[in-house]
Amino acid sequence: AGMPVRDTAVYELAKEVGSVFQNPKSQFFHLDTDSELEFGLENEGVPPEQIKSRVETTVRQLKIKKLMHRNIFSLSGGEKQLLAFASVYAMNPQIYTLDEPTANLDEEAIEKLRKQLIRLKEEGKTVVIAEHRLYFLADLVDRAVYIRDGRIEKSFSKAEFLAMEETERIRLGLRKLRRTTLDLEKARAYEAGKGLGICGLGCGYKDEPDVIKDLSFTAYPGEVLGISGHNGVGKTTLIRCLCGLIREQKGSISLEGDVLKRKQRQKNCFLVMQDVNHQLFSDSVFGECEQAGASDEAGIREALAQFDLGDYEETHPMALSGGQKQRLAVATAVLSGKKVLIFDEPTSGLDYRHMKEVCEMVRNLAKAGKIVLVVSHDREFMQDACDRILMLGEKEEGA
């Protein structure tokens, strides 16, 4: 925009640069979606009639009518990401900066975002994306910059980026440059009565219709069961119920054939949440591991080293990056010693190497006899990590 950043007031920069953060909740100012879309425009002093028109145009072009007139706290993680992008889009900035914009989006939402970013380019907008999930950028990117330790190490043209050899991609810790097709092997037979059994389950939130209705499946020891589906279909609601964070309205949940009440599920299940900020409470990384129930100092240090957190023992968890927080939460799950381990988008914001480490970790937990469930939209991760995938609202894959 021709403005020297150091000499320009933040409020002036904000008129030209729109930012979508990795954690969309950190940029929300209202409780309802309509007000959130209007907020930025109101701050710019846009007349009310123009605000109404811009919001209507945003909703129509981004196809987010289903997000309107809703409480933001009722949105899924992916829906919050879409709302954050829409709130910036409504302000019509010249420059867009997006931090991990697809981290919690399903395939359909990623495709919508990709098309919208192409449109922004055609309109002459500048788009800067910090991203680990790369496949959706294939026909979008003009230049790719590789950063290590805060410095630009490599710069690729579009042709160079897309022609990168796999060995070079892996060496740099980059994700696949092409979309992964799920192709799971035929699931093996499991012993009846074993595992976590869900029968006719119905669950949801107070004063709202059940999100999950009449759902039945079994997660067995020794396997990694993936759970996927569109944003807002009820994946997080389901696993919160399995862990005893919300009550079931219908049906039953059993472990090894014994029906578990809510408090019993809390004792037997450990959940790594989609937004790990909700479960990091200690004033140090080491203390967080102790709080998870681990008492063996050597075991804690071994787990932290495994997840590249060995140098951060005394660091406050809130001072970690998004990916580091994610790895810390996964480490606490491993150290908890519970029978059922459930991960909600565990590879969100992770590069190739750390994604492969989480993949190996969940596979090893399954081999150790744990019951492992993983909610994810990350096809590259699910292909390598999961034995079966339960597609909510669709036919199960690998069955």
Regions found by a protein language model. Name each.
Residues 1-12, 252-265:
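ABC ATPase NBD Q-loop/coupling interface
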Residues 50-67, 297-312:
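Conserved ABC ATPase "signature" region
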Residues 71-75, 79, 316-320, 324:
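Conserved ABC ATPase signature
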Residues 96-99, 341-344:
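Catalytic Walker B motif of ABC-type/P-loop ATPase nucleotide-binding domains
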Residues 131-132, 376-377:
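H-loop/switch region of ABC-family ATPase nucleotide-binding domains
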Residues 228-230:
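The feature captures the beta-strand-to-loop junction immediately N-terminal to the Walker
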Residues 243:
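Helix-to-loop junction immediately C-terminal to a conserved catalytic motif
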